[in-house]
């Protein structure tokens, strides 16, 4: 760098007396970017460095030996129109036409090597005007500067361990030799005589040494491409030699294209993450392309024809290729969406803190969480075990570690009413080994609800107290009403104590003795009366011997004559007006 600074200072002092008038270069000069419909591929290996010219060659009197070297390839002379201004000797940029098909062959099929033709202006000593002399002097100085820059560039690019002959040999070209064009140098605006053909020299940016101080654009692009994943290895293309303003413009354009491509790819990726369309997920399951992103194939340098030489290559993210198994279920689509979201967020470096593991799918929970039964759940996975509907914020019941919605739990596990067979949701009445709605537990006879006295059961049915005793309690033989408390059992019937009396006089039986006639209890008198066993004379029951006469029964001692009152024991008597008479009294009274 110190040598370069010294050379630049020497050049400035040498050319300080020259007019600052701008010099217009021809359409295609060593300091301009080549044009045409060719695809230019620059060679990363630096051109060979020629030996330094002698002092005579620099003064223009003796041709340098390198000037006598001509390439074996074809040469074409492109005549430039003469102009009134001095034209400096230059050569066109060496353009290598790269054919993609030619690169398929072996290296042996490649013909020739890249030719580097160096042009040094010939200074003819002639007694010409001073402007011509100054122009020639300026051209020689520029040529010397170009040579020194090339030498400096070769020293920087070639490792010190390589020999000079290896550094001077260029790599074989993929195709045929490229045509080179030479521009003849005019000595003066008036002579019109073309000087000897100048050898082509590789163009070199005059400000290359200064740019090497700063980080190169290629290194920045390499860092950018390494930070963005690419499906294929990036092809490194060295920047060609051109003038300083055009080189800066090309590298800036390359950086801008690469940066914009990476930005566009990132935007498309973020947009695809925000969409999460089901169609995209189905394509992921079928192995189709989900997203497409544009990645720069190379530096993105435009071709001389104005067309994008590098272009972009579509990079598609594809899922695992699996045979189609029919339309996926909504649950599987949702799981796929959640898994894709989690993986894509992790790839982008977005940290998601899991709030737990879902008790159903066993995956981490990043969004809303439901906590129930000592576990955490995705809201869409906390569903009823029976109907598979989301429980959400509704009430639920737990049985055997499984959640159930309120409706299914009552239908499956709640007790049933014996009357209506419906589930009992609130209060329950348990009776007769059954469960009942409170409003359905009533008397089977009258339909009245049971009060504090309770109910009575008969044949699996519940009855109120009144209906139960009326229907099933024993009845009193006297009043035919139910016997609820104390009772008397007699004559194969239950009796209220107050109802067990003589059926004729309704007198309670003294000492519990009674007489039965036709299934009814009687006192002794009414019993004998009912049976006809009373003495017609004394009106007392006949307990022993009796005499039956005139359809009546008499004690033997009470069967006497109605007039004389003598006992009729002889067995004969006369009857008159339902009264018995002896024979003597009947004759006396009625004869």
Curated annotation (Swiss-Prot):
UniProt GO BP: endothelial cell migration; substrate adhesion-dependent cell spreading; transforming growth factor beta receptor signaling pathway
Gene: PXN
Name the UniProt record assigns to this protein: Paxillin
Positions of post-translational Phosphotyrosine modification: 31, 88, 118, 181
Residue stretches of biased makeup (Basic and acidic residues): 289-300
GO terms, molecular function: metal ion binding
Sequence motif LD motif 3, residues: 216-228
Compartments, record wording: Cytoplasm, Cytoskeleton; Cell junction, Focal adhesion; Cytoplasm, Cell cortex
